[in-house]
Amino acid sequence: MGRLHCTEDPVPEAVGGDMQQLNQLGAQQFSALTEVLFHFLTEPKEVERFLAQLSEFATTNQISLGSLRSIVKSLLLVPNGALKKSLTAKQVQADFITLGLSEEKATYFSEKWKQNAPTLARWAIGQTLMINQLIDMEWKFGVTSGSSELEKVGSIFLQLKLVVKKGNQTENVYIELTLPQFYSFLHEMERVRTSMECFC
């Protein structure tokens, strides 16, 4: 197997077999499954709806739900990696072909990827920003009055208190910085703000 764009990790053994099963699906079946998959990728919180759609697809196409879940897990390998690495539709297509999916189906999936890429990118950025949402920040300046290291006496330091939202809870994070570290941190925060304004 060739090198993949979406991951450097070894690919699970089941993936090759799952791709062969996907190749056996008719064009209409593959199209319907891809539609279900992109609904899930663009609205990942709708897990129950996704599982219900998979169950319905399995029943309609007389495929066991267990094998369909394995197929979908293998199929999600590329888009999940592609989101993390911002891959192009061509790279997504190449990865599916490398994994053993037929060129026709890989092309169809990559076209769908191209159509949904802006929505998926916005969602991925939103997820990244929601991991630890900064709610509030306070800082206090201080001067070192006593230290075992003579040159540190009289140096200015800064204590930061960050209020971070983790899930449904808030947590206080305390950081102590030297003045140069603080200015570097401030500079990075300005860069983040500028980047964020580009997306709004």
Swiss-Prot record:
One of its GO terms (cellular component) is cytoplasmic vesicle. It comes from the Eukaryota. GO terms for molecular function: NF-kappaB binding. One of its GO terms (biological process) is tumor necrosis factor-mediated signaling pathway. It is found in: Cytoplasmic vesicle. Pfam families: COMM_domain, COMM_HN. Keywords: Cytoplasmic vesicle, Transcription, Transcription regulation, Ubl conjugation pathway. Widely expressed with highest expression in lung. InterPro entries: COMM (IPR017920), COMMD4/6/7/8 (IPR047155), COMMD7 (IPR037358). Residues 133-200 form the COMM domain. Disulfide bonds: none annotated. Belongs to the COMM domain-containing protein 7 family. Component of the commander complex consisting of the CCC subcomplex and the retriever subcomplex. Component of the CCC (COMMD/CCDC22/CCDC93) subcomplex consisting of COMMD1, COMMD2, COMMD3, COMMD4, COMMD5, COMMD6, COMMD7, COMMD8, COMMD9, COMMD10, CCDC22 and CCDC93; within the complex forms a heterodimer with COMMD9. Interacts with RELA. Interacts with CCDC22, CCDC93, SCNN1B, CUL7. Scaffold protein in the commander complex that is essential for endosomal recycling of transmembrane cargos; the commander complex is composed of the CCC subcomplex and the retriever subcomplex. May modulate activity of cullin-RING E3 ubiquitin ligase (CRL) complexes. Associates with the NF-kappa-B complex and suppresses its transcriptional activity. This is COMM domain-containing protein 7. It comes from Homo sapiens (Human).
